[in-house]
Amino acid sequence: MLQEEADTVLFSGDLTTTSLDSEFREVADAFSPLYEKWGDNLIVIPGNHDRYTPKSVKAKLYEKYFPRAFAGSGDRVFSKTLSDDVCVIGFDSSKPFMLRSNGDFTLELKEEIDAEFEKSKQLHKHIILMGHFPYSYPSDVPSKFHHKLLGEESLAELISRHNPIAYLHGHKHVRWCLRDAVTPETLCINAGPSGMSSSDPDKHAGWMIFDVTESGNIDQLIKVHLSKDGEPVRETVDLN
């Protein structure tokens, strides 16, 4: 990833597997070169695996090892300017469920995001929203109760009103992009896993790259996965 010449790097969570101190320490070391290159333009939010146990949340392990991430301030919602016309709004809907992998999109969280949209719209023409959990799935990837965002319909309703140009997320460890019928103006992008191994390129370690045009369109969406030799393999996604 250090080879990429991106303006901004967005990471939508699941830095760890079970939110152990040793895992956070290892990941923080791995992210150090990325922070050296991108600084505050490397934007990280936690996933459910980073809030996996009540003990890790109480100890604030995520905040300890990623103090530059937005949740280090104690907030669950943030916004950051990416250019004169574009900003990103991120939110943290992860909490420890122990035997389940749900997120929780509460009314309070929805109200905070609503307020952040209203504020950001005064300053920027185009907004990208980033959370950890999807609210829409491809037909071949079923949504399961024990793994879904509780309140995903409420998130979809919020997005249908504010029409961000994209919703970036993760959680399901497979790369995809789609437009949901409820939110046709918003492109949902799942960057997939950054560190897994699979014979399926969309489930293998990689990321997604895209540009935002002056008119706010998502342009040049590219899937990237790593070859056996660790070299990036690129595939342009047809958005038509």
Regions found by a protein language model. Give the residues of each.
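Active-site-proximal segments of metal-dependent phosphoesterases and phosphodiesterases across multiple
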Residues: S101-D104, S120-I165, K172
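Extended active-site neighborhood of metal-dependent phosphoesterases/phosphodiesterases
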Residues: R25-A115, S154-S160, V182-C188, G206-F210
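N-terminal active-site segment of His-dependent metallophosphoesterases
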Residues: M1-R25, N240
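A general structural motif
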Residues: E5-A6, G39, Q122-H126, P164, ...
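Active-site neighborhood of phospho(di)ester-bond hydrolases with catalytic His/Asp-centered motifs
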Residues: T8-D14, N41-N48, D92, I128-G131, ...
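Active-site environment of divalent metal-dependent phosphoester hydrolases
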Residues: T17-L20, V44-S56, P96-R100, F133-S139, ...
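Conserved beta-sheet core of the metallophosphoesterase superfamily
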Residues: K144-S215
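A short C-terminal boundary segment appended to hydrolase-like catalytic domains
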Residues: V212-N240
